[in-house]
Curated annotation (Swiss-Prot):
This is mRNA cleavage and polyadenylation factor CLP1. One of its GO terms (biological process) is tRNA splicing, via endonucleolytic cleavage and ligation. It comes from the Eukaryota. Keywords: ATP-binding, mRNA processing, Nucleotide-binding, Nucleus. GO terms for cellular component: mRNA cleavage factor complex.
Length: 451
């Protein structure tokens, strides 16, 4: 019998979606972990019913729903855990659950750092080194979480990877005192100071704008930006006894993006007075360990160099996923997250009311920039081809300041240029708070965002 017009017994896509969004129960044995991958179009909801589970060192509260979007992480069972979850796109038969064989090394490292904090008012300065997908950032996040878990420490987390947006958008180097628990649902660890109400205590990062995506595009500028950040960190440590005693956790870029001499690491080691270096590698006699020891020993003899195995909970992240995180960081900066909704503000300004500079990219324009100083900023002509949909950093430097003052100035915030109208000589700029555009100089970053 044929189906009558307008009547179809086949369920729609929405019906199938709703039908599979059922609650699943899961038991995770102590010492095991669930590796979770959630794509951008999915939503995973988890509720721990009993036991102790943690994500990157932060414990999940029982009987509270946690929602995750576009994320990759592992849930570690500190005790036997019983939880409920729902997500139509994750097949129940294909859950990735396995034993965590590296948690004991992380615990031992944490307790060693605790002893250093207890023994001296000059806290440990830890530099974490490794390749891509070794768990560097996960280890840094876990150590920060453990440091504040039982004592009132406030470690300074320092992100030196411009491709990662942590408490900020990508393209920046940041230093953030961690004084409260980190948001396990957020890919950027939580919110910086915002105009909206947040579930958790917001953080106040110290931000320096590099402006480019890759270190190799202008290594000299990267090193100069790193040194400027280190000066700000030193000043904060001098004026804050608690942060000074808590120390610093430094997440470095992957080894693959550095030069053969490891200049980025040796500069970090020197500028931040590092005394603990952690190499994440599964090779017991990794030649990089010897190379690091030789390079760093020429700078200081008083440091500890340790090798830890690559973390068990690591989930590989490809370039497509990293791009999606960069876009998400920009979106969350202006619009917030599903749990913390923000209302950005669009203003109109004349071409003459803004001054924009840009960093030199030696990879894109080698012939144009061969005679210029690497740390020099170049003026940007206001036109659609250069500024449409561009993310700009608003500096503390006055709009009419010279380029050297702009380059040295800290970052006030970010704006998104949504429209450039040549005929009317007007721009529309999205800002995170209402009010007039600050009369400050801007730095054009390498990132674009199209709504």
């Amino acid at each position: 019998m044929s189906i009558l017009p307008g009547i179809d017994s086949t369920p729609t896509t929405n019906e199938l979606f709703e039908g599979t969004n059922e609650i699943h129960k899961l038991e995770i044995e102590k010492g095991y972990e669930w590796k979770v991958e959630v794509n951008a179009e999915s939503k995973l909801v988890i509720e721990v019913k009993s036991g102790i589970a943690e994500i990157f060192g932060t414990e999940l509260a029982n009987d509270i729903e946690y929602s995750f979007y576009n994320n990759k992480f592992s849930i570690l069972a500190v005790e036997d855990v019983s939880l409920e979850w729902r997500c139509p796109e994750i097949p129940e038969q294909k859950l990735m659950i396995g034993e965590n064989k590296t948690a004991k090394y992380v615990y031992n490292l944490h307790f060693s750092l605790e002893k250093m904090r207890a023994a001296s008012f000059d806290g440990p300065k830890v530099m974490i080194v490794g390749g891509s997908n070794t768990g560097k950032t996960a280890l840094a996040r876990t150590l920060c979480s453990y440091a504040i878990k039982y004592k009132s420490y406030q470690p300074m987390f320092i992100n030196l990877n411009p491709e990662e947006g942590i408490f900020s958008v990508a393209g920046c180097l940041t230093a953030t005192p961690i004084s409260d628990i980190l948001d396990v649902q957020s890919t950027i660890w939580g919110h910086s100071m915002t105009s909206g109400a947040t579930m958790l205590h917001s953080k106040q990062p110290l931000v320096k704008t590099f402006g480019l995506e890759h270190i190799k595009e202008n290594q000299d500028l990267y090193l100069a930006t790193l040194k400027q950040l280190s000066e700000v960190v030193k000043l904060r440590l001098q004026n804050d006894v608690l942060v000074h005693r808590s120390g610093c956790i430094i997440d470095t870029p992957p080894i693959s993006v550095m030069d053969d001499d490891l200049t980025e690491l040796t500069t970090t080691f020197k500028e931040f007075n590092v005394n603990v270096v952690i190499l994440l590698s599964d090779e017991q006699e990794d030649p990089l360990l010897t190379k690091l020891n030789d390079k760093l020993s020429t700078i200081s003899s008083s440091f500890n160099l340790l090798r830890l195995p690559i973390l068990s909970g690591v989930i590989e992240r490809d370039d497509v996923f990293k791009r999606s995180l960069q876009r998400l960081a920009i979106r969350e900066y202006f619009y917030g997250s599903p749990s913390v909704v923000l209302s950005p503000y669009t203003i109109g300004v004349d071409f003459e009311d803004i001054t924009v500079w840009r960093p030199i990219n030696f990879i894109e324009n080698p012939e144009e920039t061969s005679q210029l100083l690497p740390t020099q900023l170049l003026p940007v002509e206001v036109k659609p081809t250069t500024l449409q949909h561009a993310l700009v950093a608003i500096s503390y430097a006055d709009r009419k300041a010279n380029e050297s003052n702009v380059q040295l100035a800290p970052t006030l915030g970010f704006g998104l240029i949504t429209e450039v109208n040549d005929k009317r000589r007007k721009l529309r700029i999205l800002l995170p708070v209402p009010g007039r555009l600050p009369d400050k100089a801007m730095i054009l970053t390498a990132y674009r965002y199209l709504e």
